[in-house]
Amino acid sequence: VRRAELLDRHFPRRSELDFARTVIERGLGLDLTAEGRIHLDLEPHQGREIGVRAEAVRVPDEVHVVGRPLGGVGDAEALLGALGRALAAAHTDRTLDLELRMLGDEAVSAAFEVLFAGILHERSFGERRFGADRELYFERASLLDVIRLRGIAARVPIESDPEGIPADARVAGAASAALGLPIEAPVAWLELDPDRGASTCLRGFALAAVLRQELRSTFGVNWFESRRAGRYLRDIWSYGRRYDAEELAREVGANGLRWDLVREDLVGSSA
């Protein structure tokens, strides 16, 4: 399901960067590299892990997007997500104190990653991109989001365990119960991301849903093709981590994080 080989023809190998450039520069009117502050290193070096991630070294002046994309829809989503995170860091107001540029609430950065990776999930975008395969794509996207959210939710009691690192049996049991499938311990451990806590990931999803609704209501369902939306995002990114996820949600007009919007997005993707 993650690899989605049947959809590969829509994203030939080595086409991910051109696709991302089209979305970010032609659609939103943003510079992919943020005037050189974002450094791209996507060459297939030996030993480099598969996938793409963003790493902020000096915010906002040095942000790296690194990895080894193999092609296909999954890597296209991952690259867009990494660039969403990178653009947020690279547009942070440099006059902010260090703790407001690089520390603070990680859920805010996670939200921009989820928001950009989810551009392909937008109905109007996906229908044009995938054509006759659009329903296959939307079903896959919705299923993966459900799997991911349930897997993250399963980590909450594990990470709050006062006894420390849980045993294999407990990890496997929690993952299996969340997904409704028998998950062996080695696979379950892969889902435990030591750099991002479960609550951070969940709050990132919720903030992304709030931002997505605001973008749609202000700039239309094709917000990802609006340069005004790009300027709006740039203004929000300038805040850095001045606000936590709940505060930023209120700053853009919501009454805090909206979990109902997360559910609506899941239902909408599969509608």
Residue ranges, per PLM feature:
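Contiguous, non-catalytic segments that form substrate-binding/exosite surfaces or channel walls
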Residues: 1-73, 251, 263
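Glycine- and acidic
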Residues: 2-10, 60-73, 93-102, 136-143, ...
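Active-site-adjacent bridging/hinge elements
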Residues: 51-64, 82-93, 128-134, 175-185
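Active-site recognition of the HExxH zinc-binding catalytic motif
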Residues: 70-93, 110-114
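Feature representing long, continuous alpha-helical segments
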Residues: 85, 110-118, 152, 156, ...
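Helical catalytic core of nucleic-acid polymerases
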Residues: 90-137
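Long, amphipathic alpha-helical stalk/connector segments used for oligomerization, subunit docking
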Residues: 118-195
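C-terminal, non-catalytic "cap/extension" segments appended to globular domains
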Residues: 160-271
